[in-house]
Amino acid sequence: MQEIQKNTKKEQYNLNKLQKRLRRNVGEAIADFNMIEEGDRIMVCLSGGKDSYTMLEILRNLQQSAPINFSLVAVNLDQKQPGFPEHILPAYLEQLGVEYKIVEENTYGIVKEKIPEGKTTCSLCSRLRRGILYRTATELGATKIALGHHRDDILQTLFLNMFYGGKMKGMPPKLMSDDGKHIVIRPLAYCREKDIVRFAEAKAFPIIPCNLCGSQPNLQRQVIADMLRDWDKRYPGRIETMFSAMQNVVPSHLCDTNLFDFKGITHGSEVVDGGDLAFDREEIPLQPAGWQPEEDDTSLEALRLDVIEVK
């Protein structure tokens, strides 16, 4: 009996610690990008997956202690996919006492009618879903639309665009919507997926399967996701360093003439961003930028990234 109580206390301690980390990550993202302002009405897009459940939970938690007042309304789009458990989200949200709206639109039928069997349906489905959510935000008087993409999603998108699209383009934590009428925010931008997975399991959220439409997963994105997970296991800190790099861009040391006036450099021009350090031996920090070891991590020396000097 004592052993059970001991385990329960430890589980609660770990859950509290995890929730504090997620809350801190979300709070920092909100502050860094001015995501939420006084009087905002936030439309929280709830899919029934781990990410959106976590986003709603953390925003509700922050709402109680934030120095500003803002309201939340959860929105789920029932796309009439076969087997969709339409009772789960209303029951969950009513239990929490959260204002919500279930939008019923048969986008599944439209996609099946327009897209030939065997072809990818995700592109059309996304466009339809986006338009419905924008319309719903207007109807509800929402000032911001919150999506549940996290740090790993942002990095995956960056590598997808680099590997397949020839662009250095990620997924912004805050942006103006396609129709120019709504501000979209991603409060989980600084949150690690593995933290969200653990939090969702500990909270026992009623997860709704994401493959009800029968579509295949994005294989290219899956390859990138597997690559990042492998790096995270083999080289602790690499993911954090890459995300830090997205926040420390030096246009003068890249090749985009739209971001920096290379043609304007002439004799007498001032040195920009340290000039050319290509021939200098660069000091590699022992601890990867942006990485904070967990309490149960082994020694920092053992976890140091492998550094290969290119000559």
Curated annotation (Swiss-Prot):
A cellular component term from Gene Ontology for this protein is: cytoplasm
In terms of InterPro entries, this protein maps to: Rossmann-like_a/b/a_fold, TilS/TtcA_N, tRNA_Cyd_32_2_STrfase, tRNA_thiolation_TtcA_Ctu1
Subcellular location(s) per record: Cytoplasm
| Segments carrying motif PP-loop motif | 47-52
GO BP term (any one)? tRNA thio-modification
Pathway assignment: tRNA modification
What family classification does the UniProt entry report for this protein?
A: Belongs to the TtcA family.
Q: How does it assemble?
A: Homodimer.
Functionally, this protein is described as follows:
Catalyzes the ATP-dependent 2-thiolation of cytidine in position 32 of tRNA, to form 2-thiocytidine (s(2)C32). The sulfur atoms are provided by the cysteine/cysteine desulfurase (IscS) system.
Q: Would you tell me the protein name for this molecule? A: tRNA-cytidine(32) 2-sulfurtransferase
